[in-house]
Amino acid sequence: MIERGKFRSLTLVNWNGFFARTFDLDELVTTLSGGNGAGKSTTMAAFITALIPDLTLLHFRNTTEAGATSGSRDKGLHGKLRAGVCYSTLDVVNSRHQRVLVGVRLQQVAGRDRKVDIKPFTIQGLPTAIQPTQILTQVVGDRQARVLSLQELKDRVEEMEGVQFKQFNSITDYHSLMFDLGVVPRRLRSASDRSKFYRLIEASLYGGISSAITRSLRDYLLPENSGVRKAFQDMEAALRENRMTLEAIRVTQSDRDLFKHLISEATSYVAADYMRHANERRIHLDGALELRRDLFSSRKQLSSEQYRHVEMARELAEQSGAEGDLETDYQAASDHLNLVQTAMRQQEKIERYNADLEELSYRLEEQNEVVEEAREQQAENEERADAAELEVDELKSQLADYQQALDVQQTRAIQYQQAQQALERARTLCQLPDLTADNADEWLDSYQAKEQEATEILLMLEQKLSVADAAHGQFEQAYQLVSKIAGAVNRNEAWQVARDLLRDSSSQRYQAERVQPLRMRLSELEQRLREQQDAERLLQDFSKRNGQDYQPEELESLQQELDARIETLSSLVAEAGERRMALRQELEQIQLRIQKLTTRAPVWLAAQEMLTQLSEQSGETFEDSRQVTEFMQQLLERERETTVERDDIASRKRQIEAQIERLSQPGGSEDPRLNALAERFGGVLLSEIYDDVTLDDAPYFSALYGPSRHAIVVADLSLVREQLAGLEDCPEDLYLIEGDPQSFDDSVFAVEELERAVVVKVAERQWRYSRFPEVPLFGRAAREMRLESLRDEREALAEQYATLSFDVQKTQRLHQSFSRFIGTHLAVVFDEDPEAEIRTLSSRRGELDRAIASFDGENQQQRQQYEQAKEASVQLNKLIPRISLLCDETLQDRVEEIRAELDETEESARFIQQHGATLVKLEPLVSVLQSDPQQHEQLQEDYAQAQNAQRQAKQQAFALTEVVQRRAHFSYADSAGMLGENAGLNDKLRHRLELAEAERTKAREQLRQHQAQLTQYSQVQASLKSSYDAKQDMLKELTQELQDIGVRADADAEERARQRRDELHAALSTNRSRRNQLEKQITFCEAEMDSLQKKLRKLERDYHQMREQVVTAKAGWCAVMRLVKDNGVERRLHRRELAYMEGDELRSMSDKALGALRLAVADNEHLRDVLRLSEDPKRPERKIQFYIAVYQHLRERIRQDIIRTDDPVEAIEQMEIELNRLTEELTAREQMLAISSRSVANIIRKTIQREQNRIRMLNQGLQAVAFGQVKSVRLNVNVRETHTTLLNVLSEQQEMHQDLFNSNRLTFSEALAKLYQRLNPEIDMGQRTPQTIGEELLDYRNYLEMEVEVNRGADGWLRAESGALSTGEAIGTGMSILVMVVQSWEEESKRLRGKDIIPCRLLFLDEAARLDAKSIATLFELCDRLEMQLVIAAPENISPEKGTTYKLVRKVYQNNEHVHVVGLRGFGAEAPDTQEQAS
């Protein structure tokens, strides 16, 4: 036996007067007694707040405010709390013996609005030993405690093992948990449910008959039949949808051609533009790629031209530099030629001057000889004149001396004097101061020897002098010759120089003889050197052109390679034309083939599109025509099989629908005739009585009653007996059972229950064994379960039927499509894919184009290589003969060596040429140079010195001899000279003096003559010398000029210079022609580059424009593709056959479709606007949006419950298949769904009867309730008269109003409302719509009127009104009604709650003192019988012997207010238990 949950205690923490107080609640009645303001209402308010923590509902007022709509500002809660955290908790033990602490944390909110903050929470699993106050407070001293905050409470609870704390943010969650745990009687899902519960508690608290309860007693007592309402709503929705679908089908049938036209024209309009844009995009892409290729090729060509221009500019610079060098060389060569010519002229002048000089030299030599001879004669004359002069002087001196010695004495005296003079003179001359007459002999010998030596020297010098005098002229001539040859030479070195010159003259003459051979050799070598330089220049040019350095030794092998390469390139160039022609022919063939395939491709694509559709529709793949024809035969067989299966499903479906219709009868009557019989007999169907039987009990009762489960229960069988005789329309077996339908039980049969079966003793000798049915149908729950399974099965069969019907239609359509396909496309569909072949051929064409372009490039490159190779070969042919020159590394050295030798030989030649004759003249005179002409003078001086020395020696010897001779004279000191002895000598001397003077005069005359002649000769010599010197100077100048010219003026020099000049002129002309050619080529190249740059700029501009168009088109195209793919219309729009049409054709196609579309969408504003927007050619995505809008429009028009596809095109294709089938099926479905008005009336009546029976059962519990004069209380339930009329018309006169119920424009609810208005025209419906009124009429509660009646005194049964009853009677009557409501709620929520949970029952009653003792006892009895807890408040203990009583006294102590509580347990049945506690 499941026990009912109970409230164990109520705990208040920090309430006004209650710091921490727990009230243990009695299992029946808990009484709160005390005076006014003791805290009774506060305690109940705390209980109600913990039970319903909704500030929008809580309003605690006094009983004096019972009728008021508003109370105090704080609604009675704020003033009951103290500052800080407050708690109100309920300790509950439910049917599962689970202890649950539910409560709220309250806290005053500061402010003038006096608000209160409430937080609900629960604590589960709290041990029994722990009291709520222990968990909510914390002891801080011996007599002090602190209230915990909610967070601290949560932390403390979480520390306990097995205890759960849960805080709630919504009251719904809080009440949901309380319902699941059995704390509240019903699930409070919404604020309306909470309001009803609060109104119930409030009515109980303040007592009396609550008008809020009685006015809406139906809402409190009668459960909402949501299942019936939902069934009606679902039925109406299904009917509405069915009718809308049928209407949509009819509209679709009427609009089918419009749909086809719209989708066809929209597809043509958009697909043509889509494919045109696709084609243009491809064309633009190809154009952009072509422009990019042209751009790249032009850039490459420009780069090549720029490289060529750079190379030519470099070559031009080189040529210009070379031209400058050549011009310089040419100018130098011209200048050299001029110099050579000048030198030749100079050489001629030099030769003339040389000839003149030779002649002058010869004349000058002759004149020199004449002058020399004249000078010698002059010298002789001078010597003779001097001798004559000397002789005159000596004679004069001698004459004078001899005159003085005329006297002997005088002579002796003179001799002595002379001896003395001689001695002094000897001493002076000999520088002998010691000389005396005595030692004079000794000194005389030595001085005589000196005199002898001096004489010998003088003789030798005289000899030399005579010889020198003889060779003096030749020496001067030879010295002049040496000076002429060697320049200024020391006279002492003249002989050595002359010897060297004569010795070198032979080699000089040999070298001079080698000049011409060396010149020829040098000319030859210089020619070879120039050729070598030209060859090196050619080799450098060749290497530069070929980009590689070559050695001369490699040229022969390179020539062989070049020859082989030229031969190869020549063959390649020769083959290039044939190869290119072959490629061109293949390209033309491919283009012709592509044209043919392009013509055939649309036909093949259309066939493939049809084949793809057929493959998608059939799910098969077809490889050849045989498979297509075989599949057509299979389609015929499949159609026959599917038709048979569909008919079988239809039969099964009809059977199930019959079962559903039979089980759907009201009251569980499978035969509608039984309802009529039950009404006729005034009975009730047994199935109706057991209509509320649970699903678990249904098999038992079904087996218990067996075939009689469809019996009619009547109150008296005898009254029915007479009516049985005339029965015609009734089942074959009709069971009648006597019993009270209001209190029927199953005691009719003696029954024994077995395992899944029962044995029923029908009579003494008749038993019936019935097994529990596998699918019970007894009771509403069993029938609903069976109906649900049957409906599911029916839905499955309906779906199968629809699928099979669709398959049949689809197969038929598919067969027709195959027939059309065979007749139209079978001939071409299995051909090879022309597009694949086109792609292959296009790829091959691209390869051929690239091959031809590459081939042309390679051919051009080969031609260039061929030309380069030929040019290189030509250069090599020039170089090959010069390899030996290139390899001759010593040529330059030899040229320099020969040039040095030639310089030497030319120098020698010039020397011989200049001095050859002089050397010839010098050769016989060289010996005379041994004596220097200046040495002749020296010799003369030496001779004069020797003569002086000899004279001095002679004088010294003479002086000594005179001293020696006059040694005797020293004795003549006293002698006188003898003058007479020398008289004859004087005469001789005079005579000789005369002769000498005459000779002297003659010599002087001759000297003057010779002097004049010498002067003449000297003048001639000077003239010749001057002329010779002038010509010599001129020759030197000419020679210097020739040397300054620096060229050799030989016979071949001019020819070589002219040849060199001509060669340089030719090279310069060639260079200039090459430069002019390069300039022309550079000009052409620059023009080509300018053209290419202009072309490049144009290409770049066109490419960027094209690329911008492509990018812009790509952005638009991406938007288009995104729209297309996101909406799945690519397959419809990407019609490949349109890709082969021209843009103008596609534009024309789109324009034609546009015109048709304008007419087609003229009545549709949305499509018309979208179509107008789509006409913008710059926004192609808008056409797609229009197509999508058309699709969406068609999707909306073709609903998914009609056509099973999202594609309107496929929907249109399926439409003809589906429309007829759906029309037929939906018509049948409407007939099936449309419930009859009689059925509706029966359902409402049976529901009313069921609820009336339930109210009667509730009334049985109120029969023993008595309060004061009230002996009994009951609920009276009556059907309203207007609604009874409506039910009668629905069940019996529905044919009269079929215009309402058969109208497709009205739902059943609207038709019901219209019928109600038709039956009750006097009733004002206000602003409510027929649908709202109809929905109200489908709710059975609106058919009933409920009122509370009391049996009071002599008045009998009266309507319970507060005015007709005393306060106690009203309180008791109201409490009875509330108990009935709570009990009704529990039964109503039984299915929602766990089977092992029976909820707590608790009500309140304030001011219970108004009840008398009998009423109190009745109330206590009611609580005991209904297992209900009651909390009452009274000024005094009204029933101390029962329940638990708390005496509350409010006291004030030291400005602190608290309530003193004394508890007393009832002593009527057990010993009293008194407890006292103060808080």
UniProtKB/Swiss-Prot annotation:
Keywords, comma-separated and alphabetical: ATP-binding, Cell cycle, Cell division, Chromosome partition, Coiled coil, Cytoplasm, DNA condensation, DNA-binding, Nucleotide-binding
GO terms of molecular function: ATP binding; DNA binding
Binding site for ATP: 34-41
One Gene Ontology cellular component annotation held by this UniProt entry: nucleoid
Ranges in coiled-coil conformation: 337-418, 511-603, 780-810, 847-1116, 1206-1265
Subcellular location: Cytoplasm, Nucleoid
This protein's domain notes: The hinge domain, which separates the large intramolecular coiled coil regions, allows the homodimerization, forming a V-shaped homodimer.
Assembly information from the UniProt record: Homodimerization via its hinge domain. Binds to DNA via its C-terminal region. Interacts, and probably forms a ternary complex, with MukE and MukF via its C-terminal region. The complex formation is stimulated by calcium or magnesium. Interacts with tubulin-related protein FtsZ.
Name of this chain's protein: Chromosome partition protein MukB
Species annotation: Pectobacterium carotovorum subsp. carotovorum (strain PC1)
